[in-house]
């Protein structure tokens, strides 16, 4: 009789909620994992690569215009859109037999120099299609209760449609209507000088005045 072994587990993202009080704003994704071997899974050292599948949703003309700097000429959307990497997260999945649930904490950023943040900021409503690509190591109890180890196949993935309102709500709650761009030190110094020369209240006001 051949010994039972853990095959490829199945993952499904079943929900998301914001966590605005952490040092870095987080989206907490609830993930269900299923294993049909019937063996006790001690833990899974799991890594998830999370990407935005921008080609899996439709865009109205106004949104196409906002995305033009990211994907090129608006008329070519969605032909020019491709996946955008959001981040890579790791976790230790708790012990389970048959099925279990765990949380993936994904840090988010309002830095508009990041393609994923710029994309999400451009979406007024609807959902953002995500793909979670999983890999890692499974530790489980063999038929004789000895520790066995196997790998999570690279083919394991899950899709989820993130409500855009969740992302916008978390950014608004954490950053109060602000976005962020990176500027060279020389550019910041020029802004500082202009602020002093014009007697302006802030760098934000200085940039707004320069753009008029």
List each language-model region with its residue ranges.
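Short aromatic-acidic-glycine turn motif
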Residues: 51-62
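Short, basic amphipathic alpha-helical segments that act as recognition/interaction helices
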Residues: 201-212
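Low-complexity, acidic Ser/Thr/Pro/Gly-rich terminal tails and inter-domain linkers that flank the onset
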Residues: 1-28
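Short beta-strand elements
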Residues: 65-74, 139-180
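Surface-exposed, Lys/Arg-rich phosphate-binding patches that contact polyanionic backbones
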Residues: 185-202
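Internal, hydrophobic beta-strand segments that form the core of beta-sheet-rich folds
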Residues: 47-53, 101-154
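Extended, solvent-exposed segments with strong compositional bias
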Residues: 66-122
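Contiguous beta-strand segments within globular domains
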Residues: 20-33, 42-50, 106-110
């Amino acid at each position: 009789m051949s010994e039972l072994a853990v095959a490829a587990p199945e993952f499904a993202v079943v929900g998301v909620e914001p966590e605005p009080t952490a040092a870095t704003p987080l989206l907490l994704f609830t993930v269900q994992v299923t294993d049909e071997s019937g063996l006790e899974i001690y833990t899974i050292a799991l890594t998830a690569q999370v990407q935005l599948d921008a080609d899996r949703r439709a865009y109205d003309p106004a949104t196409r215009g906002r995305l033009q700097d990211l994907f090129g000429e608006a008329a070519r959307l969605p032909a020019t859109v491709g996946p955008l990497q959001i981040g890579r997260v790791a976790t230790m999945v708790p012990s389970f037999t048959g099925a279990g649930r765990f949380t993936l904490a994904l840090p988010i950023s309002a830095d508009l120099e990041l393609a994923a943040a710029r994309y999400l900021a451009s979406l007024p409503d609807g959902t953002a299609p995500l793909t979670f690509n999983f890999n890692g190591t499974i530790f489980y109890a063999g038929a004789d209760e000895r520790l066995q180890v196997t790998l999570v196949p690279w083919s394991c993935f899950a899709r989820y449609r993130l409500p855009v309102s969740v992302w916008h709500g978390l950014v608004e709650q954490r950053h109060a209507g602000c976005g962020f761009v990176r500027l060279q030190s020389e550019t910041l110094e020029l802004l500082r000088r202009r602020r002093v020369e014009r007697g302006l209240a802030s760098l934000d006001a200085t940039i707004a005045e320069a753009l008029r």
